[in-house]
């Protein structure tokens, strides 16, 4: 238990931030999982590209806002684009 007022405030702040981070990371994971699922199901190319665009936008937003390190976001985007490109060429992963 915190002994000082400032430590109590830090606990409150970290709980709030942790909850916010969890929401954003869960949404990001859901979008990435959607893209991978569509690729596995061999869905329409247009549908995969729309899901891919949404995932990339979310990753970019998370990097700008500081929820995710920019290199981490870049790495995730790179892996996702490699999957999508392979899918669009006809080599379903």
Curated annotation (Swiss-Prot):
Residues 12-23 have a biased composition (Basic residues). Signal peptide: none annotated. Residues 1-23 are annotated as: Disordered. SUPFAM superfamilies: Ribosomal protein S20. Residues 1-11 have a biased composition (Basic and acidic residues). Keywords: Ribonucleoprotein, Ribosomal protein, RNA-binding, rRNA-binding. Gene3D superfamilies: Ribosomal protein S20. One of its GO terms (molecular function) is structural constituent of ribosome. One of its GO terms (biological process) is translation. GO terms for cellular component: cytosol; small ribosomal subunit. Binds directly to 16S ribosomal RNA. Belongs to the bacterial ribosomal protein bS20 family. This is Small ribosomal subunit protein bS20.
